[in-house]
Amino acid sequence: MVKSTAILGSTGSIGRQSIAVCRARGIRVTALTTNKNVELLLKQIEEFKPEYAAASDTEAAEKLRSALAGTDITVGPAGEEGLRLAATWRDTDCVVTAVSGAVGLRPTLDAIAGKKRIALANKETLVCAGSIVMRRAKETGAEIVPVDSEHSAIFQCINGRRGELKKILLTGSGGPFRGWTREQTASVTPEQAVKHPNWSMGAKISVDSATMMNKGLEFIEAMHLFGVTPDDIEVLIHPESVVHSAVELIDGTVIAQLGVPDMSLPIQYALTWPERCVSDADRLDLTAMSGLHFMKPDYELMPCLKLAIDCARLGGNAPAVMSAANEAAVALFLSHRLGYNEIYESVSAALSDIEFIAEPSLEDILASDREAREFIKEHYT
């Protein structure tokens, strides 16, 4: 179990649950960051007394600096630099990357360079630059332990037996609009899209779960985390969200990880691994369940999932373009400036427009990210 951790994005959904795990397990918190929620961050600071704090938003950063004036807490700059300083803060064993978007990439690489454990909750880091990130982690010996429930499940099922792995079975609920036609989803509102049937999550990831883009991002992430090809991963729709994922081994054995839909469990495991600690989470009562159901995804009704898998096969800068365009499109949708079905259409258009780079450098990836965001802004606002 780690003794100290920095939490990037401590006021978001994953960040707040990470805070709760640190409280329960007595893990020292050395650094905390937020985007804009200074009010909650100050409450967290009062309780955990970190050495460092930062807010990414410029106005929020000034508010934080003013509130902490005269204290011993170092207040970092706004923007990416504040996150990077948190990720490399002294005497920190682990960094929880609970920020959303490509902004988490450089801080994660910095933490890897510092040989810290990465409790990875930022999908975009591996989606955009998985090959680079995993290579650098191997070079430094930094541990990357997934926080996503699906990847945590796979991590636990493999349990070091990488050579015995035949196939990853990546499960997803299908979201709140499972079975809806494209005609029906055309009128979906942000308020409907953020209401996931099983999980309590932030707005962006809730929309991604509704469109199934989230499962596509997880598909790409799994490729890099576990060193497999697209042909080694099968997506299964599992409405109950009880089987968080499974693996098929070379002898035909299938090992699955089951549990209640509670993100505190994979967060705790990422911080305590290789130990397993007592948890206050609800227990799974198998006798209370009427059944577990699994089905193949309908790609016509889930075009974002198909698009992501196509990008996984294509590789290069395609996943980075897709991820950035999707992030920008979802932001427009949440502000009622883009239709639900237009999320897929706009991301697909960005992929068609932006130049493909087969073997991108980190700079190429970041440039592709910026270009994709600009494309969405220019053509859809």
Q: What are these language model-derived features?
A:
Residues 1-381:
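Catalytic, metal-anchored helix/loop core of enzyme active sites in primary metabolism
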